[in-house]
Amino acid sequence: MSDGQKLTHIDASGEAHMVDVGDKAETVRVAVAEGFVKMKPETLALIRDGNAKKGDVIGTARLAGIMAAKQTANLIPLCHPLMLTKVAVDITEDTGLPGLRVEAMVKLSGKTGVEMEALTAVSIACLTIYDMAKAADKGMEIVNIRLLEKSGGKSGDFRRQES
């Protein structure tokens, strides 16, 4: 494994530790992640029409994703607590699944990236959709949660290339 591929959360003795970012330069960091909730067409219609028993599925899931991004350091042991400057969660209908596509964009000016915050936002938004619609469709699937892009920081930019 080259230095560029070294696991940063593992020290020389193989123990997990929180990375010291104190000497790193502050840069603007942005990460975008996505995930999907596949469901029956009838369940998608129920959500679209605002008829889910628990209320506004999309609005609630959007808020849950935003809240989750802000709590990432409390959920993932070695993540730094961050002062996020922007979290946006967009949930759109994808009739091809059928289901919902969840995208989260997280931004800050700081010393460490926000990939985990974007992925956490997507994960919790998807789980919230499942929770709020499970009475209608227990067979829903949460799929393809992944980082789409990140910018800023020493490791440079990343953009997922689709084949």
UniProtKB/Swiss-Prot annotation:
Pathway: Cofactor biosynthesis; molybdopterin biosynthesis. One of its GO terms (biological process) is Mo-molybdopterin cofactor biosynthetic process. Substrate binds at residues 78-80, 116-117. Pfam families: MoaC (PF01967). The keyword Lyase applies. Belongs to the MoaC family. This is Cyclic pyranopterin monophosphate synthase.
